[in-house]
Amino acid sequence: MVWFFEYYDGCGLAIKVKKKLYEAEGVQKVEIYETESMGKMLVIDGKIQLTELDEPFYHEMLVHVPMLSHENPRKVAVIGGGDGGALREVLKHNVERAVLVDIDRNVIDLSRKFLKIDHGAFEDERVEIAIMDGKEFLRDCEIFDVIIVDSTDPVGVSDTLFDREFFELARQKCDVISLQSQSPLIQKEYFRTLLVNSAPFERRDVYLSCVPTYPLALWSFIIGGEYDFSNLEERFERIKGKTVHYNPDVHRAAFALPEWLKKEVEACI
């Protein structure tokens, strides 16, 4: 048995692993592990992206909050998310078309082979896969009801998904957007930058989820655009029985921010 360590901003996380299943170098360094207590684990460029144990706490909140805040989402784009978790959640809704845009085919191929958390989403006839930069995709793409940004940390190949131009393009291409916005506890500069750069979505809010394998477990998301939280119970009937974590009570509670975080958000929006 060996331990996998991830270090960030003066602290870290250790996870006992049984074995490394695969490692590949390309656009990014992709590693997949079998862990002692958290199932399979995906690591990109040294950063934990998911474990089987807690990935629903992330993917369900990233996807169902915007999807159930839209009256009738039919066309959805997932930017990033090559592991297939977000795509899996999107397809629980009655969508007509879902486009997955990821710059790194390795992530998709290795996730399909080793992780298999997509539960067949990659083979769904409603799905189209585009291997390209997310910002470049937005320049010429069609209009979507919802865009979901499931990116890695805002460095390296993902940094173009966090600048002001990205959000200016996205605002022209969707009704509602959601994105992960890092740890508001120890990644404050990233968090603040995302709040500021997402200003093309004049209406936007922050919400939270607990994701134990992410830095300090408290993880933030931003939703922007023309979202509507009424009729959550009625809309939840679309996916009732299909979620592990998400429900309307969790949805509403996620927007109850502690006072220190309210001040952070108000200072940036």
Curated annotation (Swiss-Prot):
One GO term of the biological process aspect: spermidine biosynthetic process
Binding residue positions for spermidine: 59, 83, 150-153
Binding-site residues for S-methyl-5'-thioadenosine, renumbered to this chain: 28, 102, 133-134
Domain PABS: from-to ranges: 1-226
EC assignment: 2.5.1.16
GO molecular function: spermidine synthase activity
Keywords on record: Cytoplasm, Polyamine biosynthesis, Spermidine biosynthesis, Transferase
Pathway noted in the entry: Amine and polyamine biosynthesis; spermidine biosynthesis; spermidine from putrescine: step 1/1
InterPro entries xref list: PABS, PABS_CS, SAM-dependent_MTases_sf, Spermi_synthase, Spermidine_synt_N, Spermidine_synt_N_sf
Reactions this protein catalyses: S-adenosyl 3-(methylsulfanyl)propylamine + putrescine = S-methyl-5'-thioadenosine + spermidine + H(+)
Active site: 150
Quaternary assembly: Homodimer or homotetramer.
Family assignment from sequence similarity: Belongs to the spermidine/spermine synthase family.
Name under which the protein is recorded: Polyamine aminopropyltransferase
